[in-house]
Design a protein with these regions (language model features):
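Exposed alpha-helical structural elements
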Residues: 11, 18, 30, 55, ...
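Small-side-chain structural scaffolding
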Residues: 22-25, 30, 39, 85, ...
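Short, low-complexity N-terminal intrinsically disordered segments enriched in polar/charged residues
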Residues: 1-33, 37, 135-140
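Short N-terminal micro-motifs specific to bacterial/archaeal maturation
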Residues: 6, 22, 46-47, 102
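A solvent-exposed, acidic/Ser-Thr-rich amphipathic alpha-helical stretch
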Residues: 28-30, 34-81
Length: 140
């Protein structure tokens, strides 16, 4: 992904750079340091959000293992520099997908809300099935 300056708050910019590093290395071991204790994950396959940093870390650490060829393409920021939208593509088995991560940060640069949207529906269903199998098997 090309670097494009975004109007981000300094703490958010540092956290976003660390997020991109972790994704590029497919190693989310340091994720907990980026999460607010009350962070919330909003899944594209579940109606109810998943509250708490441990739930967010567990979901993101598992989904990065399910996605193949995960790549970010474009990124956008809110005017206040506290929110980003990251467009991505990936595969789950034979299904190609496109999606966006909508991430809200606090003043310390910690993630407080992480929402994911994915299309098409067939790829989302494949992701839900793959995540279900992984979590049933113990996940991380």
């Amino acid at each position: 992904m090309k670097d494009h300056p975004l109007p981000l708050a300094p703490a958010v910019a540092a956290s976003l750079a660390e997020w991109h590093r972790m994704i590029a290395e497919r190693d989310l071991a340091a994720l907990s340091a980026l999460l607010h204790p009350d962070a919330v994950f909003r899944s594209p396959v579940a109606h109810k959000p998943y509250p708490g940093a441990s739930a967010v870390a567990m979901i993101l650490s598992n989904v990065i293992e399910v996605f193949e060829g995960f790549t970010y393409h474009r990124q956008f920021a809110s005017a206040d520099g506290m929110n980003v939208v990251l467009e991505f593509s990936a595969r789950v088995g034979e299904r190609e997908l496109k999606g966006v991560d909508l991430i809200r940060f606090d003043e310390q640069g910690r993630i407080v809300d992480f929402e994911v949207m994915i299309r098409p529906a067939s790829a989302l269903a494949a992701l839900g099935e793959a995540m279900g199998r992984r979590l049933a098997a113990g996940g991380r």
